[in-house]
Amino acid sequence: MANVFEVLERDHQEVKRLMDELEERPRGGADEQERMRQRKNQVRQLIIEESKHEAVEEEYFWPAVRDLVPQGKELAEHAIKQEQQAKYVLNDLIDYEPGVARFEEMLGDFINDAREHIAYEEEQVWPELRLVISPERAMELGTKIQKAKRLAPTRPHPHTPPRPGLLKAAGPFVGAADRIRDLVAARTRH
């Protein structure tokens, strides 16, 4: 079992790893078409990881920050605003192909914003939450987030309001629908 900070840190590390790979833009080896296919797959994986992460944060983490941290409401609202903007970018990114100028511009903007958002969470929010959360509550929250992530949406849903009650009720169904779409999309690519 891991506490909330360990769970979210693992997610952040995975997202940063994917962003690092995308920034490297592989050269040589495979032909150009193969490199673009790999790049599209990396972006799909980034979208999946980021979508699941943000969904469970909105469902569990930000409500805890609001409830426990003295200025938690303001911290959470700022972060959720960043996350909502990212959802719009990721949702639009799905429609473009790698190598196209708009795709690369949007991806670069997303990566810069995502790094800023991760730093905001880790450097401003987490220290405040660590001051007030009990070890038991941190473990409980980590467990809930890990479980919820298994059923979380795998695609961005920018038009869904980031309300915890709505996410708890609809999240598993939206996640299931996303997984079906992911399977169908995978079949049509092969």
Protein language model features and the residues they cover:
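Small-residue-biased structural context
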Residues: 1-190
